């Protein structure tokens, strides 16, 4: 649920769902996108290279506790799994995500991930120290391992593995790989400094420390003949968004392309600017044009109070003492205020139209069970224990029922208010194989062994084949 530009009123969080900075075509391409959330989880992963509050796809981290595994995803959420033995898997029904521990050559034949498991290199499947995550039987796998590093001179070998795992690569259902290269030694030890995508392209990620950014700011001030601004050489080691080592991503270069080896760009594909407190301040595209700018709270590092697309008005935000958004100010459009009560959120726009959200559940399982619209109408929703929609009642009192599969959450049946039903059927890979409407007519789909659609039969009998 989002409101305005945008805010998640259920969490009281300022969010930016996904802004893509790099996306070149090809098999299993490297896509660099940014998501932001002002929400603070109770078990945060360390701050990533885009600064507090921000996440990118590579910011997936698994914490290994005594009896618990905590997967921090790139949306800022923390997913809990029980301890896994080699070859065991855990499944989050609320997020439709599997976590599997390596250590076996094959999964049980009846397992939904059995075929996808075989797409992995044998080395990964047999390693009990690696974990693999996916949100679909179609893949891809996120490979969670550890970064190789150069041991200290006095270190006892072999060194124990760390109590966490980081993203080291992706593997799709065709066995194609994307590799994240972590620095083995030096000031950026353990950080991602390179990526090789499924097309064989290599990207170099240029990182900087807080001290390097401070020195650069001083040199720019000297060359410009201005007074240097207050730019500290170090940052506090902890924020509300997790531990912070102060390392940030400053630019991404394409350094190798097998298709165009002699025609590489002479400038970075994207460049980032930073505040003296290590917060993402600006994004520049490959033409060095600033396309985004961000402003943060003076007291709370990483809490966004304004953002702007170049050439558009600046949108501003205000928060309460609990860190929840209370106002969203848009000088060229609708502004919003948010009032939080127990199990009730009131949203009022600048035209004095009001919506009231009645909620049940907590944190990530909080759902809107009743919505009072600005026109006075009311809609209601029912959810199961893991937050999946079971029924919706419209303003006229008509109820539509939904039947999700117990395991996958995929909708298997929809019953409209007049009692007419549509049924949906899926294969072991969660792909739709047939759908029958209230009129009894059927849509059918067929796939090859790799899960690619090869034939579709329309309800009128027309057949379309794909090659």
What are these regions (language model features)?
Residues 1-45, 118-123:
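Intrinsically disordered, low-complexity segments enriched in small residues
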Residues 14-19, 55-57, 63-67:
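Short alpha-helical segments and helix-capping/turn motifs at coil-helix boundaries
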């Amino acid at each position: 649920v989002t409101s305005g530009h945008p805010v998640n009123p259920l969490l009281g969080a300022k969010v930016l769902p996904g802004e893509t900075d790099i996306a070149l075509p090809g098999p299993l391409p490297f896509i660099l996108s940014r998501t932001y959330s002002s929400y603070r989880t109770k078990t945060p992963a360390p701050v990533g290279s885009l600064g507090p509050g921000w996440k990118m796809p590579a910011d997936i981290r698994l914490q290994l506790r005594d009896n618990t595994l905590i997967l921090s995803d790139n949306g800022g959420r923390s997913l809990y799994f029980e301890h896994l033995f080699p070859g065991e898997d855990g499944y989050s029904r609320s997020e439709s995500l599997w976590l599997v521990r390596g250590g076996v050559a094959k999964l049980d034949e009846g397992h939904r991930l059995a075929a996808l498991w075989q797409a992995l290199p044998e080395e990964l499947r047999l390693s009990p120290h690696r974990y693999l995550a996916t949100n679909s039987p179609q893949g891809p796998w996120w490979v969670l391992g550890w970064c190789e590093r150069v041991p200290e001179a006095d270190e006892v070998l072999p060194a124990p593995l760390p109590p966490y795992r980081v993203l080291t690569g992706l593997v799709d259902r065709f066995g194609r790989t994307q590799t994240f290269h972590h620095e083995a030694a030096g000031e950026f030890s353990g950080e991602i400094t390179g990526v090789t995508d499924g097309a064989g392209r290599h990207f170099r990620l240029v990182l900087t420390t807080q001290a390097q950014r401070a020195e650069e700011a001083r040199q720019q001030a000297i060359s410009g003949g201005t007074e240097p601004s207050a730019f500290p050489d170090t940052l506090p080691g902890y924020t509300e968004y997790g531990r912070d080592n102060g390392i940030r991503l400053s630019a991404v270069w394409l350094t190798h392309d097998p298709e165009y080896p002699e025609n590489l760009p002479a400038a970075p594909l994207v460049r980032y600017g930073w505040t003296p407190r290590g917060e993402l301040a600006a994004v520049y595209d490959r033409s060095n044009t600033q396309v985004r700018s961000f402003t943060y709270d003076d007291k709370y590092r990483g809490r966004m109070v304004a953002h702007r697309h170049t050439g558009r008005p600046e949108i501003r935000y205000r928060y309460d003492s609990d860190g929840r958004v209370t106002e969203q100010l848009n000088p060229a459009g609708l502004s919003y205020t948010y009032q939080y009560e127990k199990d009730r959120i009131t949203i009022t726009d600048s035209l004095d139209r009001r919506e009231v959200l009645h909620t049940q559940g907590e944190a990530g399982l909080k759902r809107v069970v009743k919505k009072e619209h600005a026109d006075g109408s009311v809609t209601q929703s029912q959810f199961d224990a893991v937050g999946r929609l079971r029924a919706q009642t419209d303003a006229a009192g008509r109820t539509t029922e939904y039947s999700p599969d117990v395991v996958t959450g995929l909708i298997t049946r929809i019953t409209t208010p007049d009692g007419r039903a549509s049924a949906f059927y899926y294969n072991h890979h969660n792909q739709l194989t047939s759908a029958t409407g209230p009129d009894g007519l059927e849509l059918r789909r067929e796939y090859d062994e790799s899960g690619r659609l090869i034939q579709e039969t329309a309800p009128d009998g027309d057949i379309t084949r794909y090659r």
